[in-house]
Amino acid sequence: RFAKIVPAGNFLVVTNHKYKDLVLQHIPEIGEKQVLCEPIGRNTAPCIAYAAYTLLRENPDAEMIVTPSDHLILNEDDFRTIIGECLEFADRHDALLTVGIKPTRPDTGYGYIQVSDDHTISKVKCFTEKPDLELAQTFLQTGEFYWNSGIFIWKVQAIVEAFRKYLPEHHA
C-alpha cells in the first residue's frame, strides 16, 4: 500500500534478524540495504531511532512514515489521502504526527489518543495505554478519543531533535 505513496527505493524496514529473508521475499522491490535488523529487540523507540539516524545520514530533509506491518486497511484511497495530508503538515510545521482511528466500540486492546479539538489534524492532549473496559467506554462516549494506530509521520530532523530532547539515551 505504501508503494503508491512513496517509491519503494525510499523504504526502510526495521525488523528482527530472523525475519530479514521473509521481508525481502514479501517486498521484492527493496534491496538488502533497505532492511535494518535490530541488534537487540527493545521495543519501538530504538527501532525508530535506528531508522531515523540511518535516514538522516542519507537525506536529512527526508520525511518518515512509521507503521506496523500488520494493519488491516479497508479503504486504501482514504488511507493514502490521510497519509498525504499528514506528510504535507509535517513538512510545513516540523510536527510529530500520529494517526488516530475513530473507535467503533470500547476496546481494551488498543491505546487511546485524546485530541484537543475535532479538526482533521489536532494536538494530542494525552495517550492512554490499553485502558480497562470501563475507561474505554467513557472514552468512546466523550467523542474526544481515537484508537492509537501506531502510525507516525514526521520529518527526520524533527524526530531526531525529539530524541535529543526527550529520550537522550536514544540520541546518537
Annotated model-derived regions:
Residues 110-172:
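Catalytic core of tubulin tyrosine ligase-like
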Residues 41-46, 105-107, 133-135:
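A short acidic, often aromatic-flanked loop/helix-cap motif at beta-alpha or helix-coil junctions
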Residues 4-7, 28, 53-60, 88-95, ...:
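Generic secondary-structure signature for well-ordered alpha-helical cores
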Residues 72-108, 118:
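Conserved donor-nucleotide/metal-binding helix-loop-beta segment in metal-dependent transferases, i.e.
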Residues 1-66, 74-80, 84:
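Conserved N-terminal catalytic core of the sugar/cofactor nucleotidyltransferase
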Residues 14, 65-68, 98-102, 128, ...:
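Short beta-strand segments
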Residues 62-64, 95-99, 108-111, 149:
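Generic beta-strand structural signal
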